[in-house]
Amino acid sequence: MALQETMKALSYPVRRQILVLLREGELPAGEIAQQLGMSPPATSHHLQKLKTAGLVFERKEKNFIFYELNTSFFEELLLWIKQFQSTREERHETAEQTLLDSHLSSPDR
């Protein structure tokens, strides 16, 4: 996963709106454009950026292009983010244990 490309793709509110629409399932580009009140070329531009970042898949059927979320990408992203939460929680637990140990080993006890 190219984090810089992903963050750049997510930095546009309209792209985040597209992802929200795609949570419900696969949609054709034309319907995405219609729901967002955008021109087809502008919608295609944003969809291409999301595709390049690996956030969506594209499927062509006759004259239509359908898009869907790349859910495995989001699962990997959540796992990557979770590692920082674990580290923070571990540091907090270590700090609590150190305080408890120093309190219990205090000569005043």
Residue ranges of predicted features:
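Amphipathic alpha-helical dimerization/coiled-coil segments
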Residues: 1-2, 73-109
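N-terminal helix-turn-helix DNA-binding core of bacterial DNA-binding proteins
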Residues: 2-41, 61-73
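Short amphipathic alpha-helical "recognition" segments used for binding
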Residues: 12, 52-53, 66, 89, ...
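Terminal low-complexity, poorly structured segments
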Residues: 32-34, 43, 95-96, 100
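Alpha-helical residues within the helix-turn-helix
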Residues: 34, 51-52
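Residues within the DNA-recognition helix of helix-turn-helix
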Residues: 46
